[in-house]
C-alpha cells in the first residue's frame, strides 16, 4: 500500500485533533478558556469576544476573536486544536453575510453590534 505525502501527514495529524469542539461560525460570540502559566501555577483565563475570521485547515485551523477592552480593540488568533486552548463555549450565534468581518475594525460603539441568529442551536 502506497500513500502520498499528504495522506501520511493527515494520518499523523488526526491523532492530535480535538473532537469535543463546538461548531463555530463567523459572527458568533464565544468564550475561550486559555491556559496561562504564571510563576509555577497554571490557570485558565477566559477570553470573550466575536469571531471575525476563521481559517480551516485540519490541525492548523484558527479563529480570530475580537473584543473591546478599556476602549481599545483587541484581536487574538487561536489555534483551535492547541493544548493551550482549554475550552470553547458559544454564547450567542451571530447573523452575518460575510466570511471575514474585518470591517468591524473601522466601526465604533453600537455600529459593531451583530444581529442574533436563532435558527442555529448553541
Swiss-Prot record:
SUPFAM superfamilies assigned:
Translation proteins SH3-like domain (SSF50104)
Q: Which UniProt keywords apply?
A: Ribonucleoprotein, Ribosomal protein
Molecular function terms, GO-annotated: structural constituent of ribosome
Q: Which InterPro entries match?
A: Ribosomal_bL19 (IPR001857), Ribosomal_bL19_CS (IPR018257), Ribosomal_bL19_sf (IPR038657), Translation_prot_SH3-like_sf (IPR008991)
Gene Ontology BP annotations: translation
What's a single GO CC term here?
A: cytosolic large ribosomal subunit
Gene3D superfamilies, A to Z: 2.30.30.790
Do you know which Pfam families this protein is assigned to? Ribosomal_L19
Q: Which family does it belong to?
A: Belongs to the bacterial ribosomal protein bL19 family.
Describe the function of this protein.
Answer: This protein is located at the 30S-50S ribosomal subunit interface and may play a role in the structure and function of the aminoacyl-tRNA binding site.
The protein's matches in PANTHER family, at most eight in alphabetical order, are given as: LARGE RIBOSOMAL SUBUNIT PROTEIN BL19M, RIBOSOMAL PROTEIN L19
Q: What is this protein called?
A: Large ribosomal subunit protein bL19
Which species is listed as the source? Synechocystis sp. (strain ATCC 27184 / PCC 6803 / Kazusa)
Q: Which gene encodes it?
A: rplS
Amino acid at each position: 500500500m502506497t500513500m502520498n505525502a499528504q495522506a501520511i501527514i493527515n494520518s499523523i495529524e488526526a491523532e492530535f485533533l480535538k473532537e469535543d469542539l463546538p461548531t463555530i461560525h463567523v459572527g458568533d460570540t464565544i468564550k475561550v478558556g486559555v491556559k496561562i502559566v504564571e510563576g509555577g501555577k497554571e490557570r485558565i483565563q477566559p477570553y470573550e469576544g466575536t469571531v471575525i475570521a476563521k481559517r480551516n485547515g485540519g490541525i492548523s485551523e484558527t479563529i480570530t476573536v475580537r473584543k473591546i477592552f478599556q476602549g481599545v480593540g483587541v484581536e487574538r488568533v487561536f489555534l483551535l486544536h492547541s493544548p493551550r486552548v482549554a475550552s470553547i463555549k458559544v454564547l450567542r450565534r451571530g447573523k452575518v453575510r460575510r466570511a471575514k468581518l474585518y470591517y468591524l475594525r473601522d466601526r465604533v460603539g453600537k455600529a459593531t453590534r451583530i444581529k442574533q441568529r436563532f435558527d442555529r442551536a448553541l
